[in-house]
Amino acid sequence: MVGGGVIRQLLRRKLHSQSVATPVLSWLSSKKANEDAGSAGLRAFALMGAGITGLLSFSTVASADEAEHGLECPNYPWPHEGILSSYDHASIRRGHQVYQQVCASCHSMSLISYRDLVGVAYTEEEAKAMAAEIEVVDGPNDEGEMFTRPGKLSDRLPEPYSNESAARFANGGAYPPDLSLVTKARHNGQNYVFALLTGYRDPPAGISIREGLHYNPYFPGGAIAMPKMLNDEAVEYEDGTPATEAQMGKDVVSFLSWAAEPEMEERKLMGFKWIFLLSLALLQAAYYRRLKWSVLKSRKLVLDVVN
């Protein structure tokens, strides 16, 4: 009896301790869950803040990169960029007219001769007449002196300045580049030149351009010494084409593209001829492989060994 009473007392104490511990454990578990939820919310908020900060910093870096290297210019459908496409020679002639009347006062094309224009934009008589309009310093003569003479087809297009120092002095320290290879010397050359010529605009709010420079987002740094040169009706085309800003930009870029790659049409034609000849050679090789060599390759020799 005494042993049974002791056992019952021990059981009651154990049950009582479990009943007291259960609310405590539930309170601790709920507290831990609340703390986990709060820490998860803080982590999510921190990640969101880091993402927003990263986006803002990325946009800032992108804006700084555009300001430093120039705005990325769009791609335009130039008609001579096709595999078998050729230059628009009427556009080249108009582009040369734009170069003569607008660009030649500052920019040179020292790699182009008048004879290069024959058969491309002008007849031989027209090119000779243009060359005769300039005076070229030549010599020495029999007396050892230099002299001037009318230009010939073999002469290069005239340069506006005698040297780089004179060019910089006339342009406020800026040096106008030679345009002979400009579409190959610039990244995305044709599109860049067209976007640069037609991309002048007023500077946005908060950007100041110092005196003597002009805002152009396509030029590295956004400030260029060359003013806007292409304006509607600035040139009167010989063929009556409306001389809009976009038309003049397209024509002068066509002329500069030809100047940089005058052999493009011949290269494309030669490539087409080689592809045609190699295709015939491939067909002939396939014929001999299938009907001649395969017969020899599959032939078996039988040796009759006589004992």
UniProtKB/Swiss-Prot annotation:
Alphabetically ordered keywords of this record: Electron transport, Heme, Iron, Membrane, Metal-binding, Mitochondrion, Mitochondrion inner membrane, Respiratory chain, Transit peptide, Transmembrane, Transmembrane helix, Transport
Its membrane topology: Single-pass membrane protein
Domain of life: Eukaryota
Membrane topology (Mitochondrial matrix): 289-307
Domain Cytochrome c as annotated: residue spans: 90-197
UniProt subcellular location: Mitochondrion inner membrane
Transit peptide: 1-64
Transmembrane intervals: 271-288
GO MF entry, a single one: heme binding
InterPro entries membership: Cyt_c-like_dom, Cyt_c-like_dom_sf, Cyt_c1, Cyt_c1_TM_anchor_C
Binding sites annotated in the UniProt record for heme c: 103, 106-107, 226
Processing and modification events after translation: Binds 1 heme c group covalently per subunit.
Mitochondrial intermembrane side stretches: 65-270
GO annotation, cellular component aspect: mitochondrial inner membrane; mitochondrion; plastid; vacuole
UniProt record similarity statement: Belongs to the cytochrome c family.
Subunit structure: Component of the ubiquinol-cytochrome c oxidoreductase (cytochrome b-c1 complex, complex III, CIII), a multisubunit enzyme composed of 10 subunits. The complex is composed of 3 respiratory subunits cytochrome b (MT-CYB), cytochrome c1 (CYC1-1 or CYC1-2) and Rieske protein (UCR1-1 or UCR1-2), 2 core protein subunits MPPalpha1 (or MPPalpha2) and MPPB, and 5 low-molecular weight protein subunits QCR7-1 (or QCR7-2), UCRQ-1 (or UCRQ-2), QCR9, UCRY and probably QCR6-1 (or QCR6-2).
Function of the molecule: Component of the ubiquinol-cytochrome c oxidoreductase, a multisubunit transmembrane complex that is part of the mitochondrial electron transport chain which drives oxidative phosphorylation.
Name listed for the protein in its UniProt record: Cytochrome c1 2, heme protein, mitochondrial
Organism in which the protein naturally occurs: Arabidopsis thaliana
Lineage: Eukaryota, Viridiplantae, Streptophyta, Embryophyta, Tracheophyta
Name of the gene this protein is made from: CYC1-2
